């Protein structure tokens, strides 16, 4: 006794302070929301929802006390009676018993390890006593109920209720509560999904204890044991149309806060609405499906190896794999569990099976064991997509191989209004809106023509649309026809390649490369060749949207952003975006009059030229430009109103021909129209602001001091093929093909770090072309 007293006197003062339990801050996941508060993403290894003790039902509290600590309400942290009983049982060779109280488990979970030593047990007992002196019994229970690990990545009983039963903890029945109460002792051993028999034995033990403690009646125990329990896999209800945006926000949060981003319970509100996201996703998917119609079957998405799996366990293995898959547009992921010459049996999540005969397999009817498909041939273990038809039967389908992106931003602030980075985020998280570096073709020409206006050209400058050869390179118009002397306005309206090259030649490549960087492109993205006039730079759809925003907002460079506000776990505002705003804090990169003239020309493109299909929207405030690259590998349309800029792109991840005649105006523009029809619905037609210093004369728009072309420009209007030229007749509204040229390359754009001296809420002037956060 004397030694124990000395040990206590020596050890007790050295015990750690109880800040962790007094000021409990549980690990809570990062949650990302749309602008209106719909969950679009949840990240964190620990599934936990902090819940106050009064929100846990009495039936659960009683079940846990009956399971873990019968005398919880009476002891001082250590159950002396339980310790003596366990010691006698262990010494007599009986079943090994533990005697750790709930308070001791709290002490262990917060401060100690699980090592089985007398020193640890001694410290645990002293800590339990210290905790009992500091906190009330309900406070201790609250810590335990929120911190304890209960399997399936669930921490705390509120999370476990969701994970195992997909219900709120307050709604648990006695049977469900006693199943969960059995988990703390050994979450894996008593997992009701994996080990239902052991879980039931543990449940029966707890129910018997509850009867013994007069918490329930024998009849209630019997009813609970007879209750048929349904275990339902829980998934956070995340909007499936906003996953690319959520991932962008997650990456930015990780850059700012590191691993703490996933444990501090941050609540992040983004700039996108679920309605816009749905419209954007629908527009992109319907376009890509239409382009993929009639394409040959590409084969299984994946092959699972069942060679070491017993036949009776194949369905369980398939179920385990499918637990992390998602149905997209009615295309259900399935695993082939039987395959022969007559057909297949496809296993779907939840135990559903579909038997498909060869004739039912649609596009995949020749895919069983097909050597031409290699390892993508259908066999046992193949992961495929099936779809239910109107008559109730199933068939094999596939996701489009062709990909695309849509990004829509606020022209005045850069706030992302909608963003879709591909057909299916679950299949491939690569975000084509921000990461895919592709040639924009003629969609890049507006930047070239803006440079021309700055250099001394006007919208009415006459340039020869005629064959031209420069050091062995002969760019051509896609239809092989030439119109002779036409204005810059006409040239851009009908996307004339030879005119674009001539004006680039007159400006000089060095000047042109430097000028287009004003729109946000970097030098390494722009090849040092005249071919940049035809769009051989390597750019992302997001960069194109930001670039066109300069025209839309009157000459200011805004920067895109998706995070609007960040709150902590207690709903305190932690940070708020301070965007660069056109006309206020955003840097002016081109003359507002230049932007106005370019918008005037691009309005013609969108209403009379290659983008004339936009007339279907019945609006007078639209401007934009189509784009197509060589061999029809990429198709674009970027268009805008004074308030919204939307860029769309279509192409294969590994560039190849989309198909003959796949012009931007033919396949990309319809996607743009479908989205903008929704985005602009109910919004009044707005006018582009006419800046001071603009003159309108003879139906054309000029800068006041430049109403004629600079006579010193070295513009070459000669041609060695005059016979090829015909007077301008409005050609078909289609995009010009990009001739062979140098390819530029660039890596993913670097996300600028948020400056430590973030601007105040007053949004003072800033010369940096980057948004910043105001942090409280």
Q: What residue ranges belong to the model's regions?
A:
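Non-catalytic, structured segments within soluble enzyme domains
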Residues: 4-5, 93-349, 517-518, 522-523, ...
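Mid-domain, small-residue-enriched loop/turn segments at the edges of structured enzyme/sensor domains
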Residues: 474-477, 508-546, 555, 562
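Conserved catalytic neighborhood of penicillin-recognizing serine enzymes
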Residues: 89-116, 170, 237-241, 412, ...
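N-terminal type II signal-anchor transmembrane helix
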Residues: 1-33, 71, 91
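Short active-site loop at a secondary-structure junction
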Residues: 49-54, 366-375, 399-404, 427-447, ...
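Active-site SXXK
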Residues: 64, 210, 280, 341, ...
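A penicillin-recognizing enzyme superfamily signal
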Residues: 270, 274-277, 281-286, 312-317, ...
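Short, well-structured active-site flanking segments
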Residues: 73-82, 155-158, 217-221, 430, ...
């Amino acid at each position: 006794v004397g030694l124990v007293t000395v040990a206590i006197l020596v050890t007790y003062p050295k015990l750690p302070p109880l800040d962790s339990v007094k000021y409990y801050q549980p690990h809570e996941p990062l949650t990302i929301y749309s602008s209106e508060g719909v969950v679009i993403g949840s990240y964190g290894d620990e599934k936990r929802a902090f819940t106050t003790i009064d929100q846990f039902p009495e039936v659960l509290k009683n079940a846990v006390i009956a399971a873990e600590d019968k005398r919880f309400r009476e002891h001082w942290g250590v159950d002396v009676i339980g310790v003596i009983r366990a010691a006698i049982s262990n010494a007599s060779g009986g079943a090994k018993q533990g005697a750790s109280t709930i308070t001791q488990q709290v002490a262990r979970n917060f401060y100690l390890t699980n090592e089985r030593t007398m020193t640890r047990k001694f410290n645990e007992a002293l800590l339990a006593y210290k905790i009992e002196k500091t906190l009330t019994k309900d406070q201790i229970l609250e810590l335990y109920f929120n911190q304890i690990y209960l399997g399936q990545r669930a921490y705390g009983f509120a999370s476990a209720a969701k994970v195992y039963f997909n219900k709120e903890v307050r709604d648990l029945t006695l049977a469900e509560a006693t199943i969960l109460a059995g988990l703390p002792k050994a979450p894996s051993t008593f997992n009701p999904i994996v080990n239902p028999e052991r879980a039931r034995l543990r449940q029966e033990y707890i129910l018997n204890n509850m009867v013994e403690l007069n918490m329930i009646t024998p009849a209630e125990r019997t009813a609970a044991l007879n209750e048929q329990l349904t275990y339902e896999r829980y998934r956070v209800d995340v909007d499936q149309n906003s996953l690319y945006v959520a991932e962008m926000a997650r990456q930015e949060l990780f850059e700012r806060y590191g691993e703490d981003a996933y444990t501090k319970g941050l609540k992040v509100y983004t700039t996108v609405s679920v309605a816009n996201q749905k419209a954007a996703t629908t527009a992109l998917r319907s376009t890509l499906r239409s382009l993929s119609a009639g394409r040959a079957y590409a084969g299984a998405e994946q092959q699972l190896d069942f060679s070491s799996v017993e036949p009776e366990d194949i369905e369980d293995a398939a179920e385990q794999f499918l637990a992390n898959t998602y149905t997209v547009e009615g295309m259900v992921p399935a695993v082939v569990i039987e395959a022969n010459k007559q057909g297949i049996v496809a296993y779907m999540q939840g135990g559903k099976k579909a038997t498909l005969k060869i004739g039912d397999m649609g596009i995949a009817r020749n895919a069983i064991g097909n050597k031409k498909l290699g390892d993508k041939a259908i066999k046992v273990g193949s992961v495929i997509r099936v779809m239910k038809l109107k008559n109730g039967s199933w068939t094999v389908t596939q996701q489009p191989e062709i990909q695309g992106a849509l990004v829509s931003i606020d022209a005045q602030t850069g706030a992302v209004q909608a963003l879709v980075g591909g057909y299916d985020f679950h299949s491939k998280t690569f975000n084509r809106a921000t990461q895919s570096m592709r040639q924009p073709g003629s969609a890049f020409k507006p930047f070239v023509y803006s440079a021309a206006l700055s250099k001394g050209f006007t919208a009415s400058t006459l340039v020869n649309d005629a064959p031209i050869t420069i050091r062995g390179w002969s760019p051509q118009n896609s239809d092989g026809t030439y119109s002779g002397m036409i204005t810059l306005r006409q040239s851009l309206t009908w996307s004339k390649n030879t005119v674009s090259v001539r004006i680039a030649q007159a400006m000089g490549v060095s000047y042109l490369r430097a000028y287009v960087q004003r729109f946000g492109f970097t030098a390494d993205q722009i090849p040092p060749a005249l071919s940049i006039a035809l769009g051989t730079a390597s750019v992302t759809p997001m960069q194109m949207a930001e670039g066109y925003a300069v025209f839309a907002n009157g000459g200011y460079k805004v920067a895109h952003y998706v995070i609007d506000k960040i709150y902590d776990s207690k709903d305190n505002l932690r940070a708020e975006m301070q965007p660069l705003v056109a006309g206020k804090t955003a840097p002016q990169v081109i003359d507002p009059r230049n932007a106005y003239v370019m918008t005037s020309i691009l309005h013609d493109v969108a209403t009379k030229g290659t983008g004339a299909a936009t007339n279907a929207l019945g609006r007078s405030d639209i401007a934009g430009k189509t784009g197509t690259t060589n061999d029809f590998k990429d198709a674009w349309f970027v268009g805008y109103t004074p308030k919204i800029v939307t860029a769309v792109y279509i192409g294969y991840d590994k560039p190849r021909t989309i198909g003959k005649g796949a012009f931007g105006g033919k396949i990309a523009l319809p996607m743009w129209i479908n989205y903008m029809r929704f985005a602009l619905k109910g919004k009044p037609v707005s006018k582009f602001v006419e800046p001071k210093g603009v003159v309108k004369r003879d139906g054309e728009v000029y800068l006041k001091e430049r109403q004629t072309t600079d006579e010193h420009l070295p513009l070459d209007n000669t041609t060695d093929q005059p016979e090829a030229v015909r007077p301008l007749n409005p050609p078909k509204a289609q995009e010009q093909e990009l001739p062979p040229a140098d390819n530029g390359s660039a890596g993913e754009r670097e996300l600028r770090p948020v400056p430590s001296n973030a601007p105040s809420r007053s949004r003072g002037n800033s010369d940096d072309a980057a948004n910043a956060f105001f942090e409280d």
